[in-house]
């Protein structure tokens, strides 16, 4: 089988310039990208390969975030259930939460935006019956009903972006300042973000593709006090909130917002729940507003003659690609992480873009690429799991991310990825103009509809 070239994106960094050139040839890659924690080398600007630049709309600008603390991104958190054994109950808000990630928001009216609920009866506790002691971080409920369970739902600022925190923990980055997540939806930050994007484009004239990561709200990702993942919901909306946003929502729907619309008894409206009317109203509002703002950024990128690509993950809430609002944004491409065939179909089925790209696993991080690790096995499982989905709904490109120098320490892995790249190109060429045979046997109906297709 003769070798072909193209349709592959590889990562690079300042310390792997010759190796990047070698991998461009060996894997037949035609595009190079930077990643979180890496820099694009000036020496690779004129290789002839397409250049992707990762762009973070909501972080990597701590100076701005610190100067505008009121416009830091927020999320709703619910405490664990606490049982009252007397007429007074104290609940510490930050129990089992990573202290550097979140800061309790007392700037906005807590009696308006927080909620204490008697989970035994399901009723909200009157704001006259609870108070917050900012010194010790406790909510005090008085009078509490003995042996009833209580929770507190509160707003917290995201002082360490969850994705940046994950990357820092996994890679054991030392002396790295936590990146604060700012809220692009708010007025001052919105104007600043458009200027910031233009400055980025002015200084990155060599870039062909702006790889947005992403627009503009992080999926629900919370860490415990030991920096372990405490709660993850890739579809979660709990970090897409602020009083500024919620007041706009209230004006549109004509009823008062409650934190419980998001908290949902602690289930956070996950995929296995039946969503309330209020939560679905909130999603409609968020999708429209996020799409409107994303289109502004995409239009700026097009103005500079570059392609706009969205990474389908991280801060992607409100950008659900199977909904009508997505088509209005005008993106050129979507790239998604390939966990299996279902997650590949999540973006390979997307319409209204010129091409889709699968970022295959393993990511070149030390949690896999370490002494005793077996990245080749993980790569084989990932490729074989996703390959059939490519035949049924083709993607146009594949790629990898992370630290290339780690991958190069595993020659068997490097050789296997060479085979994967070649096999993908053969599959891509052979399936053009064909329609896979499919016997339709099962239809799945759920409350979420097409919004969570393949979810």
What would you call each of these model-derived segments?
Residues 10-14, 47-49, 79, 91:
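Long, contiguous N-terminal structural blocks used for assembly/anchoring
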Residues 69-328, 346:
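Polysaccharide-binding and catalytic clefts of secreted carbohydrate-active enzymes
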Residues 6-14, 29-35, 98-100, 104, ...:
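The substrate-binding groove and active-site-proximal loops of carbohydrate-active enzymes
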Residues 1-30, 159-160, 166-174, 310:
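Boundary/entry segment of secreted carbohydrate-active catalytic domains
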Residues 14-39, 49, 54, 71:
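Long, solvent-exposed N-terminal ectodomains/accessory regions
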Residues 27, 44, 63-68, 197-198, ...:
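Hydrophobic targeting/anchoring helices
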Residues 36, 50-56, 313, 338, ...:
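Proline- and acidic/polar-enriched loop/turn elements at helix boundaries
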